[in-house]
Amino acid sequence: MDALALMSASNPAWSAWPAPAKLNLFLQIVGRRADGYHLLQTVFRLLDWGDTVHVRLRTDGQIQRIGASLPGVAEDDDLMVRAARALQIHAGTALGAELRVDKRIPAGGGFGGGSSDAATVLVALNALWGLGLPVDTLAELGLRLGADVPVFVRGHNAWAEGVGEKLTPISLPQAAYVLVDPGIHVPTPVLFQSQELTRDAAPAKIADFASGSLLDNAFEPVLRRREPAIEAVFQALSRIGTPRLTGSGSGCFVEFATRAAAEQAMAHLPGNLRAWVVEGAAHSPLLDALDAIQV
């Protein structure tokens, strides 16, 4: 189905595109570039749970957000809008789009919501506008928006290095997770300024992660000392397994072999926690949506 067909008077409908959340199964800082950006090593795990981005095409070149994806975020600052405009400028297309999002991923939790929404817009509009740009180009555009955007564009679980943009696809075993959002947001630049943060970890290899020896997150000790609410979540989760931090926080998770085990464990958590049971994905559901529209 081409873009003109989707924009016809007989088919003015919105199309829905998944924007999955992610976990960082470990994260360490191994150095710093000359420009001040920190060098990381991490593993991105994509989930079967996340936001849904809705797209409706326009012929007048306008990019508009319908509703607010996040309270207090102006349209021009919204990563979805910025992604659409960046793609539009790069491709030189006269087509436009309306964008809205059903949010499930909590903001500021390290689950990648804003980055995933932006990546989904890039992938969806590349298809709907009929641009045919390669995924490498979309990933490069995404990197200008945020270091986590490329992994969502590519849609595969990955070992990541650099500032998070050097990606090596990896296979991960099926797993389920109990996620908890403590509801605390500490800006990442503030955490990078902490004197307690370890910035010179010894570089690891994928084999080290595969052996199970890499589980720590460099931001965890900083956040647990800084934020009592995060420490309280770790204490609660420690009763059902080994809690970990995702991204630069504040989201926490515990891994289980099966969804049933995760659901059973979550039943033992305090009822006031904002928690979910989700499963890891072998690849992004966004890739499945892309395949469906290209049939």
Swiss-Prot record:
Pathway the protein contributes to: Isoprenoid biosynthesis; isopentenyl diphosphate biosynthesis via DXP pathway; isopentenyl diphosphate from 1-deoxy-D-xylulose 5-phosphate: step 3/6
Keyword Cell membrane among record annotations: no
Domain of life of the organism encoding this protein: Bacteria
Function field: Catalyzes the phosphorylation of the position 2 hydroxy group of 4-diphosphocytidyl-2C-methyl-D-erythritol.
Listed EC numbers: 2.7.1.148
UniProt keyword Cell cycle, yes or no: no
GO MF assignments: 4-(cytidine 5'-diphospho)-2-C-methyl-D-erythritol kinase activity; ATP binding
Family: Belongs to the GHMP kinase family. IspE subfamily.
Catalytic activity reported: 4-CDP-2-C-methyl-D-erythritol + ATP = 4-CDP-2-C-methyl-D-erythritol 2-phosphate + ADP + H(+)
Stretch forming the signal peptide: none
Pfam families reported in the protein's UniProt record: GHMP_kinases_C, GHMP_kinases_N
Keywords, sorted A to Z: ATP-binding, Isoprene biosynthesis, Kinase, Nucleotide-binding, Transferase
Active-site residues from the entry: K22, D148
PANTHER family per the UniProt record, alphabetical: 4-DIPHOSPHOCYTIDYL-2-C-METHYL-D-ERYTHRITOL KINASE, CHLOROPLASTIC
Positions bound to ATP: P106, A107, G108, G109, G110, F111, G112, G113, G114, S115, S116
Gene3D superfamilies in the record: 3.30.230.10, GHMP kinase, C-terminal domain (3.30.70.890)
Protein name as annotated: 4-diphosphocytidyl-2-C-methyl-D-erythritol kinase
GO biological process, one term: terpenoid biosynthetic process
Source organism: Xanthomonas campestris pv. campestris (strain ATCC 33913 / DSM 3586 / NCPPB 528 / LMG 568 / P 25)
